[in-house]
Amino acid sequence: GITQPTIRTLFITKQFQDVLLSLNGDTGTFYDYIKTNAATIITGSSWNKVLHDGVYVGSISAISAGSADYSAAANALAKSKSSQGLELVLYTKTGLGDGQQANNPWLQEFPDPITRVSWDNYVTISNADAKKYELSNEIVANGGLNGSYATITTVDGAKLENVPVIVQPGQAVGTIGLALGYGRKAALKEEMMVGLNAYSLYKGFNNVQSVTLTKAGGEHEFACVQGQKTLMGRGDIIKETSLEIFNTKDAKIWNPQPMVSLDHKEVEATTVDLWSSFDRSVGHHFNLSVDLNACTGCGACVIACHAENNVPVVGKSEVRRSRDMHWLRIDRYYSSESTFEGDNERKANISGLSSSLSTFNEMEKAGDNPQVSFQPVMCQHCNHAPCETVCPVAATSHSRQGQNHMAYNRCVGTRYCANNCPYKVRRFNWFLYNKNSEFDYNMNDDLGRMVLNPDVNVRSRGVMEKCSMCIQMTQLTILKAKREGR
């Protein structure tokens, strides 16, 4: 593949590859080097065409995979495991990776898809082992998540002290996990110097180590965006079925519609409306579909939304106060039994007030080996949005295209709309996050602001914001269609 630069160089510097060529005594540029060597590979095609297409497809002979004996490595790994202590697995997070992007505030604030914690690394441990070592997590009075500290010691004496603990449902007993990539001090802004450096425990190119764990004093304050772990027996809202049932059974069997009572009759909820319907014969109408069968909760869409819509980064302390600004979130829910169907059965068998209270209290806790479900949530652009009816200044309104609009310069920040939103997807600017030295996350200097999308307004303090269904893109589509006479 051949890639071209998208913008000119920002600083008067040499490309890394040009430096390597200079060290090798080559006075040419890396561009000339690539072009010269490409000529020996490209056959039947011109350099300009390959540069235009970005890729050259050639024919190569089949390569046979070599054989190797992995038994020695397996035996060495087995011997490294001790019958005592725990097995530590060092891993890289989906967002931050191995730490090369630790200066990227988007990735620092991105909540882990499983633990839903941002701005931190921590040791994950099973519920059984947490009880054994007297480690715990708790939701405190201000809604924040706190956790115990622990000290990890490897068999060769390497030690990492005061590691925060997350009790992780579904984790294998006898194992703990710790993310690499955190704890860097060099070449980082002060705000990004978070977490602990787990590379001190990485020995012999082996990410699995035998360790001992001891409890340490104190409590750690996490920035967690989701305190609810389970659906508390409401697993029937997860509409899942098999391909066979989907193809052979009526939709009412695998996707029953909710019913409401009207005039002493049970009718489908979609047939009842307090408001007059909109005239859908006028205007363009857009739809955003999310394939929940394909969604793994990776969160790449969350970062894409941040980049496209100039969503500000607020930092760990603000996230802990539930002031994160993500327009799109991916909720993660565990079953309290081994499956969500088991949750439904348990709820159906509840009888009496005392049984109800005790059972639902237990169902708030995730099972030891639960089923997991991910749910992307953004503004649903409701037909008759409850946020629209409570805004005293009509800052949020419904368009002919079916989108729920926000007029930022009309908003006075009452936050009534956020209170009335059933999906809790509205975000309030508690501070001015751009051009503010208190929030040094690349929106307060000229270089950092170069990443902002010029087609999207940067919001100010006291203004509510939310998913716009990328209205700048839908408007661009409409303008293109007009130019083409469609």
Task: Name each model feature, range by range.
Residues 1-5, 23, 31-34, 282-284, ...:
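Short acidic (Asp/Glu) and glycine-rich catalytic loops that position anionic groups and cofactors
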Residues 7-11, 363-370, 374, 378, ...:
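Alpha-helix capping and helix-loop boundary segments enriched in small/acidic/polar residues
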